[in-house]
C-alpha cells in the first residue's frame, strides 16, 4: 500500500505542477497563485474531519507556524514565477529539491548527519552546476527561472524544517496547512490588487482558466491526502521516497506537451538532482531526524 500512496502523491503533484505552469503562463504567477490557493484552502476546510487532531491553543506555536507560513509564501511565489518564465524540465527538479535543504537544516542544527543526506546535498549542488553550465539543443532551453527555483527550494526546505521540529506535533497536519494557504491567499490577493494585469496574447475562455485552477488545486489536495494517509498507516519511508520523485512526471509532461528539448549534459544534471532528492528521502536510521517531504504546493502545492 505504501507504493500506491507514494506513487499517487507523486503523480498528483507532478500533474499539478504542470497545471500550475499552464495557468501561470496565461494569467501570470500572482493570479494563478491566488486562484489555486483559494480553491485549495476551501478543499482543506472540507477535509478537516478526515484528519482529527487536538490542536494546541497556545499562541507561541501559532506564531512559529506563521513564520513557517512566511517561508511558504516565498516558496510558492518563487515556484510559480519559475514555472511561468523558466524551462520546466530545469526548474521543476530544482524547486522540488527542498527535502535536501530540510536535511541540511537538521545537519546545521547539530543533529547527526546521515551519509545519504550528505550525499544527496552534494548531488544537488553538482546537478545544478551541470544544468546551469550547459547549453540546450537548438537553443530551446533557457536558464530563466533557475534562481527562482533555487529560492523556492530554500524557502520550502526551511519551512518544512520549522513544521517538522516545532509545529506538526502540537497542531497536527491540517490546521497548519489551512494557516499556510490562508496566508498565501492573502498575500496573492494583496499583490494582485496592486499589480498591473498583462494577460497572454492568446487567452482561452475564462471558464477554461477556472477549470485549470480547480484541477491544480484538486491535484495538490489529492497528493497531500495520499501522502498523509500513507504516512498514517506506517508507510512513511516508502511514501516519502516515491512522492519525492514527482518532478519526473512534470518533466515528462514538459517534453510531451511543451516540446522542451534538453542536451545530454542537461539531462545528466536533471538526473543527478533527482537522485539527490531520492537519497535524502530514503529510510534513515532510527535515531535520525525525519525530514518532511511534500510538493511545491506544494506542497507546492500545497506547493
Specify the residue positions occupied by each region the protein language model found.
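Specific alpha-helical transmembrane segments that line the substrate/conduction pathway
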Residues: 9, 67-73, 80-128, 177-178, ...
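Hydrophobic/small/kink-forming positions within alpha-helical transmembrane segments
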Residues: 10, 14, 18, 45, ...
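Hydrophobic alpha-helical transmembrane segments in multi-pass integral membrane proteins
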Residues: 44-54, 102-117, 154-171, 219-233, ...
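Flexible, substrate/cofactor-facing loop regions flanked by secondary structure
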Residues: 151-156, 163-177, 181-191, 196-200
